[in-house]
Swiss-Prot record:
Signal peptide: none annotated. Changing residue 150 to Q: Significantly reduces glycogen-binding. Non-catalytic subunit of AMP-activated protein kinase (AMPK), an energy sensor protein kinase that plays a key role in regulating cellular energy metabolism. In response to reduction of intracellular ATP levels, AMPK activates energy-producing pathways and inhibits energy-consuming processes: inhibits protein, carbohydrate and lipid biosynthesis, as well as cell growth and proliferation. AMPK acts via direct phosphorylation of metabolic enzymes, and by longer-term effects via phosphorylation of transcription regulators. Gene3D superfamilies: 6.20.250.60, Immunoglobulins. Transmembrane segments: none annotated. One of its GO terms (cellular component) is cytosol. This is 5'-AMP-activated protein kinase subunit beta-1. Changing residue 100 to L: Partially inhibits glycogen-binding. Residues 9-36 have a biased composition (Basic and acidic residues). It comes from Rattus norvegicus. Residues 68-163 are annotated as: Glycogen-binding domain.
């Protein structure tokens, strides 16, 4: 019972442990300080001990913060259209998204246009028109503490949900291996054989209302020979051919324009 410290030291030597030595101030020497394992879940508990110094703790926390920032997915860039309609010869765009460097705009008829991929969030911009800085009064503006007026734009994910849905649909339809231009069903190589009744079938009978061709009718004595009787509506927009006589073929067609009917005759020598 009286030699407890010596027994404890012997047990620690058998287990392979080494008791850290402390200096006169009560701290642990540099050679005996526990090592930091960066990927170990027990690293955070090391800083709760009194042996860890403040600069080392701040260094580890800064490293851990940078690691968390790198693990976050970057914001998706969204195509954003900038348009200047105020005229001019040379128009440039400058904003917080490109560190206020001048970007030339492309002329489109009377307008100047640029399409940029911007991350989601709030962005300020301005136009440089013919050597003078200006803003678009028709777009939202913001005024700084120094009195500078800039245009402001909000790039939101919700504004592109329709385009994202269309992109997903196009990706789903991009695989054309499952598509076929032929209708479903079995196919064979047997030739088509027409039935006897189909082979000797007579042409369809001419409808009876088309037999009354107004060109074949005789006009009465009291009628103007240059005028024809009013045709039936079923006779319109049909091409009629007269039997060839004296080497001439006659074609006719009747059309209606509002309340008038016009019959055209074409004579073609054969």
């Amino acid at each position: 019972m009286g030699n407890t410290s010596s027994e404890r030291a012997a047990l620690e030597r058998q287990a392979g442990h080494k008791t850290p030595r402390r200096d006169s101030s009560g701290g642990t020497k540099d050679g005996d300080r526990p090592k930091i394992l960066m990927d170990s879940p027990e690293d955070a508990d090391i800083f709760h001990t009194e042996e860890m110094k403040a600069p080392e703790k701040e260094e580890f926390l800064a490293w851990q913060h940078d690691l968390e920032v790198n693990e976050k997915a970057p914001a998706q860039a969204r195509p954003t259209v900038f348009r200047w309609t105020g005229g001019g010869k040379e128009v440039y765009l400058s904003g917080s998204f490109n560190n206020w460097s001048k970007l030339p705009l492309t002329r489109s008829q009377n307008n100047f246009v640029a399409i940029l991929d911007l991350p989601e969030g709030e962005h300020q911009y301005k136009f440089f028109v013919d050597g003078q800085w200006t803003h678009d009064p028709s777009e939202p503006i913001v005024t700084s503490q120094l009195g500078t007026v800039n245009n402001i734009i909000q790039v939101k994910k919700t504004d592109f949900e329709v385009f994202d849905a269309l992109m997903v649909d196009s990706q789903k339809c991009s695989d054309v291996s499952e598509l076929s231009s032929s209708p479903p069903g079995p196919y064979h190589q047997e030739p088509y054989i027409s039935k006897p009744e189909e082979r000797f079938k007579a042409p369809p009978i001419l409808p009876p209302h088309l037999l009354q061709v107004i060109l074949n009718k005789d006009t009465g004595i009291s009628c103007d020979p240059a005028l024809l009787p009013e045709p039936n509506h079923v006779m319109l927009n049909h091409l009629y051919a007269l039997s060839i006589k004296d080497g001439v073929m006659v074609l006719s067609a009747t059309h209606r324009y509002k309340k008038k009917y016009v019959t055209t005759l074409l004579y073609k020598p054969i």
